[in-house]
Amino acid sequence: MRLLAFLSLLALVLQETGTASLPRKERKRREEQMPREGDSFEVLPLRNDVLNPDNYGEVIDLSNYEELTDYGDQLPEVKVTSLAPATSISPAKSTTAPGTPSSNPTMTRPTTAGLLLSSQPNHGLPTCLVCVCLGSSVYCDDIDLEDIPPLPRRTAYLYARFNRISRIRAEDFKGLTKLKRIDLSNNLISSIDNDAFRLLHALQDLILPENQLEALPVLPSGIEFLDVRLNRLQSSGIQPAAFRAMEKLQFLYLSDNLLDSIPGPLPLSLRSVHLQNNLIETMQRDVFCDPEEHKHTRRQLEDIRLDGNPINLSLFPSAYFCLPRLPIGRFT
């Protein structure tokens, strides 16, 4: 029953389609035969157009199918062409042996030629990737350095504190003509090449406390601040008149070492000298004052510390007459 109902519905659809495509005269004839308003369904001529298995071939004539489906020029022409062959993408040649799982692709490290300097420190990276470079300052604190890293030419301030640097070589600061401050506090420095600082004419502050130095190298004359506290400096490790030519030196900190005498003569520019906690037992008469210039006063030198030494300062009264204040230390 369902099949018969479906075939009947299909026949009606095809009949309607066929009627629309019939010639004008045939359509007019059929319209005249259709019942008008008010007609009774009882007089409706059934003819043989009703689809049934016996007249299926007569109702639908497929012999003129091309004529029935010809729309003339009403539809745009569609050009049918063959598809272009698909572009074949050859897989990249692999150097991995068959059956071997491929490893993750390796990333190419970007070039570092645009950094301040392309030199490589002992970490295998440019200095300004290991350290922090801000303008003319380089901060290399507490990164386990064992040597002075290559520095940008424009470096003026170097901070490499709390590392494991054991030696300063002559070439470590070569060509760094703008270097003003070097701070190597809390390292393991036991030796400095004699020419390591000599050509650094712009150097003002040299800060080397808490190392293992036993001697000082030749120092540039422009230094203003020298801090070598908490080392192993001996008097024999400081060259005679080492500070005389340093006409800009204002602060000299040599406390907590192994000095047995005051290194002198000291420059007139000096404002503060700390020598506490050494092994000093005596001093020269001219270490602070010129014994022949009794009218001269060293007004700038107001801070002298000799406490923590075995010396009895009361035994050398003529050594302080030019000072605005007496040194701090033992007078009994």
Curated annotation (Swiss-Prot):
Disulfide bond in keyword set: yes
Family note: Belongs to the small leucine-rich proteoglycan (SLRP) family. SLRP class III subfamily.
Recorded name of the encoding gene: OPTC
Signal peptide: 1-19
Residue numbers bearing the Sulfotyrosine modification: 65, 71, 139
Tissue-specific expression: Expressed in cartilage and synovial membranes (at protein level). Expressed in the retina, iris, ligament, skin and fetal liver (at protein level). Expressed in the retinal pigment epithelium (at protein level). Expressed in synovial fibroblasts and subchondral bone osteoblasts.
Name this protein carries in UniProt: Opticin
Disulfide bonds: 289-322
Biased composition (Basic and acidic residues): 29-39
The LRR repeat ranges on this chain: 154-175, 178-199, 202-223, 248-269, 270-290, 300-320
InterPro entries associated with the record: Leu-rich_rpt, Leu-rich_rpt_typical-subtyp, LRR_dom_sf, Mimecan/Epiphycan/Opticin
Matches recorded under SMART domains: LRR_TYP (SM00369)
Annotated organism of origin: Homo sapiens
Protein modification: O-glycosylated. Proteolytically cleaved by MMP1, MMP2, MMP3, MMP7, MMP8, MMP9, ADAMTS4, and ADAMTS5. Proteolytically cleaved by MMP13. The degradation of OPTC by proteases may contribute to osteoarthritis pathophysiology.
UniProt site (Cleavage): 20-21, 32-33, 87-88, 114-115
The keyword Lipoprotein is annotated on this UniProt entry: no
GO terms of molecular function: extracellular matrix structural constituent
Physiological role: Inhibits angiogenesis in the vitreous humor of the eye, and therefore represses neovascularization. Binds collagen fibrils. May be involved in collagen fiber organization via regulation of other members of the small leucine-rich repeat proteoglycan superfamily.
Residues of this chain annotated as glycosylated in UniProt: 312
Pfam families: LRR_8
